[in-house]
Amino acid sequence: MKGNNTIFKQTLLLILFCIGSNTVSAQQTFTNPILDYGADPYSTYHNGYYYYTHTMQNHLVLLKTKNLADLKNAEKKIIWTAPKNTDYSAEIWAPEFHFINDKWYVYFAADNGSNNTHRMYVLENNSKNPMEGEWIFKGKIAAQTDKWAIDGNVFIYKKQLYMIWAGWEGDTNGQQNIYIAKMKNPTEIDGDRVRISSPTNPWELHGALHDDVNPPQVNVNEGPQFLSHKNKVFIVFSASGCWTDYYSLGLLTFTGKDNLLDPLAWVKSDKPILEQSHKTKVYAPGHNSFFKSPNGKEDWILYHANSNPGEGCGVKRSPRMQQIRWDKKGNPVIGDPISEGFPLAIPSM
């Protein structure tokens, strides 16, 4: 019996060791995609937690986790549902949560059911915990011209609050540009907008449409995201139509001194910094955001992409993440989109 007990104990210890090893392994690595679906992924880090969201069409959802690679097990809450029959009841796109001056804000684009009416809106929450408190609708946020607008991103540069977004120059669809403006406060734009990017390069001009609702061709710059590294300032944006496999990320580099509203100070990359890869079987990567690892030492990118060619702008888009490197000149290097199922180390704790 003693021999049998010894064998039993050794076997049990081996099983427990294997289980423990697998648990540790699962905690230390992850694979893309990090969720089965989710377009326009955005995350912000605050007080030891990541707060994540993505486009949900008619409501806003917030996920809370210490590890973005474990989003499937994150705490989840619907924090706001659009009321019916308003200018902002439908097509809620690209929400972003920001903690500014001890308050939480969520910026999003929405319309009344017709894409031509898309504008940006903002909610405010006085609670230090965005999963609690009351989210109050503060209204539309627009420049003086008040044209079609989506994909708002806010940031602070040298103590000044700015907003960047995608919009139309006039009142008809056909081309989306990137605009920037100063903000008076987190709910108001100060003055008018300045255009800093338009689709001009061949890789930005994949936008043919084949339906009766839209123009035959729409050229796209959208989804701008602020990025800084040491003393350099960038805006990463999405180019070409999301309905094409050529949806990709481009880079604007600020070459001026202090005036971010100088359009001549923004220089565009000659080619995408992230694009589809037949080699890794990832298609239409775009509409990204950035985050740092919990220890603050690593820079990471979140983006959505499709697993197969021709899947377009639908529910097949899923969020992925991978680490950013920096070249000797201080420019971001992303590389190819990582293959699905390829194990990656989680962001350093």
Please give the residue ranges for each predicted region.
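Bacterial Sec-dependent N-terminal signal peptides
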Residues: 1-28
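Carbohydrate-active catalytic/glycan-binding domains of CAZyme proteins
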Residues: 26-349
